[in-house]
Amino acid sequence: MTDQNNAPITAISRHRIGIDGEGVTTLVVFHSCPLRCRWCLNPQTWREGSNFRMMTPQQLLMSVQMDDLYFQATGGGITFGGGEPALRSIFIEEFRRIAPQEWKLNIETSLNVPQEHIDRLSGIIDEWAIDIKDMDPDIYKEYTGRNNAQVVSNLEFL
């Protein structure tokens, strides 16, 4: 097991209905984000000194498998959020390999990550919730502190 198979997780929020995808979902909130959005909803995922715990995909599965009945009965599953979950593509790929295949995997992402992550996730994510922020590059940069060229490129890729 490599360090890439460990991921910093800020929170796990269970029994979410109609918020993060179909059916009952569990939101897994990853720590860290490349953006610094002016009105960030989850600053605890990137602020210095924020709490998180390192988990392996196996540990995450053990933590959420108690909700299997809900996922199976409602067509739900796991939603990866953050922070920026697409940065944890290797972790998510391993989780998909070991989790029940009936579980849906969703992601809430800014897409402002290297395309290799999107490529790795493209075959395993069932539903993408993409927070584009703004398509105007100047407004995007003012709002997030970053350029949106990677977002546009990843949208075209998907």
Question: Locations of the language-model features?
Answer:
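Conserved AdoMet/S-adenosylmethionine-binding subsite of the radical SAM
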Residues: 61, 65-69, 74-77, 81-158
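A short linear-motif detector with a strong N-terminal bias
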Residues: 4-9, 57-59, 106-109
